A protein has these predicted regions:
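Alpha/propeptide regions of enzymes that mature by internal proteolysis
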Residues: 1-293
Length: 293
């Protein structure tokens, strides 16, 4: 089995001035993920997503959008397709890398989804250091929040930066998907988007692994990640499945976004209906990852 990792850094109207930062970010994530693939697809996805959580170019981890209360509030999920084990966290304020906590939930908890203070308590029990929310806030987002507080609603120009995700196939045929997000700008505190919802923003089976990005409420209605997986299981190529799912998102649910998918055979697909989507592909046969927006 030839290992492969796909990365996305969000589907939106990335301005020219931010293209280079996004290309660099997804490239670094792909490199981190490929190193992890030497061990397993789980390690690869965790490493890739963690890299983007640490990069303020993306709406995940440090530098995420602030909610109405002026706080960073994060969601993440990871799922292994063959065994269908998964872990998810939502609305956490004190976790630097929520994808790492999601993995702890997957491996060491008897439930799938933990939120808020309960998730943070579990993190402490698992040896994950809690951080101050202030440490996740950057000045750019503090200034954005001040403007949005005056406006009372997010203007179109503030829908910037995106959810991050990765899907991977390892040498043993393991398929894993992971997604992490800071959510929408000036969101209602406690809002959970599509990203950590299995079947909506993220999904994996023995056939494929999928991570989505875009406007969460529409993606949840479309059950987008599961739609991609169902199409693959019905015999569609990865690319066709991705494109058809994005088409459904737009036509039936008036939604915008994108997705990445990799199958058990190493076939992969990338599709989006926004002006741009940061993404990268890295296979064992490549000397370097291929990244684009």
């Amino acid at each position: 089995m030839n290992p492969i990792i796909l990365i996305h850094g969000g589907a939106w109207d990335i301005p020219d001035s931010l293209v280079e930062a996004h290309v660099q970010g997804v490239t670094k994530a792909a490199i981190c993920g490929m190193r992890g693939l030497n061990h397993s697809a789980v390690n690869a996805v965790e490493a890739a997503v963690s890299s983007m959580e640490d990069d303020p170019a993306f709406d995940a981890g440090t530098g995420s959008f602030l909610n109405k209360d002026g706080k960073v509030e994060l969601d993440a999920v990871i799922i292994e397709g063959t065994s269908m084990v998964a872990g998810a966290v939502g609305a956490v304020h004190r976790i630097k890398n929520p994808i790492k906590l999601a993995r702890k939930v997957m491996e060491n908890c008897d439930t799938i989804f933990l939120v808020g203070t309960g998730a943070e308590q579990f993190a402490a029990e698992q040896g994950i250091k809690l951080c101050d929310n202030e440490n996740l806030i950057i000045e750019r987002e503090r200034e954005r929040w001040k403007i949005l507080s005056r406006e009372k609603k997010p203007a179109k120009e503030f829908f910037q930066r995106g959810t991050v995700g990765a899907v991977a196939l390892d040498t043993k045929g393991g398929l894993v998907a992971g997604t992490s997000t800071g959510g929408t700008p000036f969101k209602q505190p406690g809002r959970i988007g599509d990203s950590p919802i299995l079947g909506a923003g993220t999904y994996a089976t023995h056939e494929c692994a999928v991570s989505c990005t875009g406007w969460g409420e529409a993606i949840m209605k479309a059950v987008m990640a599961r739609t991609v997986a169902d199409l693959v299981e019905k015999g569609e190529s990865a690319q066709d499945a991705a494109e058809k799912s994005v088409d459904i998102l737009k036509k039936r649910f008036l939604g915008y976004g994108g997705c990445i998918v990799v199958t058990k055979d190493g076939d992969y697909g990338i599709a989006y209906n926004t002006p741009r989507m940061a993404r990268a592909v890295y296979t064992a046969q490549m000397s370097d990852p291929v990244a684009a927006v």
